[in-house]
Regions:
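Membrane-proximal, glycine/serine-rich, low-complexity loop/turn segments characteristic
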Residues: 1-126, 137-169, 208-220, 298
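A short, structural micro-pattern
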Residues: 3-5, 249, 305
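Short secondary-structure boundary micro-motifs
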Residues: 27-29, 86-88, 134-136, 193-195, ...
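Extended intrinsically disordered, low-complexity coil regions enriched in Ser, Thr, Gly, Ala
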Residues: 45-47, 64-77, 125-132, 171-183, ...
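Face-selective signature of the C-terminal outer-membrane beta-barrel domain
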Residues: 97-121, 138-290
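Surface-exposed extracellular loop regions of Gram-negative outer-membrane beta-barrel proteins
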Residues: 168-170, 284-287, 301, 305-313
Length: 313
């Protein structure tokens, strides 16, 4: 019923519906080395009767710098090849992380929750190498994330969830490089430009029903649907602008998951409880279309305040 496979931790926090509370926090800082890096974090939580709101924003902005050097003397046949280089790299980055959540309690066990989480990152780096090889590399990348979650709980034990996630990471990279021989003549030259992007979209919904029966028995059943699209590509061009087939590829995958389950729980006494369920799941992709059965069993025995025995299958 938690829609996870394997071990899970279920955390239930205190419900402040019906109260009036307001809290917030602001954090900021600055780090200085060769270049400066600053960050800020804002958090707000508010509860006004049946309505609750929480908001968070985080900002990071700064530069970084690094240097490295290498010296080597490699055996090659009856000779030795000397190699040395020095590399310096400077990077710039800016990141925004934000969240806005709202909830409304219509009555006891009747609640609506909506939350949005987003991310926007940009990074840029320049690397230059001089010595036995000379190269320059420039990289620009972005990261975008949008996620919306909706949860609706009804008094008779029905819980409906829906979520949408969109993730995108475009990137551009340029490399110019030359490796020299001992006679300081051109050995190998590379001038490449590459672009890549991955876009993932995921829809998911769940519907779960629970019943509390007599004598400590409980019944639960539900369904889950998940639909995912993964589109990615990478293309690489030489200095004349020609596409390199061996370094160019694309992926377009659509996945679908259907899951239905049913289970029961039993509180035998204050110390012993048991929970069991069975799920049937279909996974569909361009190369796979199968049904699988997943049984599970969890037994718990609270021996005393300091000892707990748990059996899971």
């Amino acid at each position: 019923r938690y829609h996870v496979r394997g071990m899970a931790i279920n955390i239930v926090t205190k419900d402040y519906a019906g109260t009036n509370q307001l809290s917030g926090q602001i954090i900021g800082g600055l780090q200085q080395s060769k270049y400066a890096k600053g960050f800020g974090d804002f958090y707000l939580s508010m509860q006004r009767g049946k309505f609750g709101l929480d908001a968070q924003y985080q900002y990071v902005d700064g530069n970084s710098y690094g240097e490295s050097s290498r010296i080597a003397n490699h055996p090659l046949g009856n000779e030795r090849v000397h190699y040395n280089d020095e590399t310096c790299q400077k990077s710039f980055g800016i990141a925004h992380n934000y969240r806005l959540g709202m909830n409304y309690a219509f009555s006891k066990n009747h609640r609506l929750e909506v939350a949005y989480t987003g991310k926007w990152d940009k990074s840029c780096s320049n690397s230059n190498t001089a010595g036995s090889s000379e190269s320059g590399m420039h990289n620009d990348s972005h990261e975008y994330l949008h996620n919306v979650d909706v949860n609706y709980s009804l008094p008779f034990g029905l819980n409906i969830n829906g979520s949408y996630t969109n993730y995108r990471t475009p990137q551009q990279q340029k490399l110019d490089g030359t490796i020299y021989t001992n006679e300081n003549t051109t050995e190998t030259e590379r001038n490449l430009t590459s672009g890549s992007e991955q876009t993932i979209s995921k829809w998911m919904f769940t519907a779960d029903q629970t019943h509390s029966l007599a004598h400590g028995w409980g019944l639960s059943y539900g369904v889950k649907g998940q639909f995912t699209s993964n589109k990615s590509y990478q293309n690489t061009l030489d200095k004349e602008g020609n596409i390199l087939p061996n370094a160019t590829s694309s992926v377009d995958i659509n996945e679908r998951i259907w899951n239905i389950y049913a289970g029961f729980s039993k509180q035998i006494n204050k110390a012993i409880s048991i929970e069991a369920s069975v799920a049937a799941e279909q996974y569909h992709s361009p190369i796979w279309d199968k049904w699988r059965i997943y049984p599970s069993l969890n037994a718990l025995w609270n021996i005393n305040e300091n000892h707990l025995l748990n059996l899971s299958f």
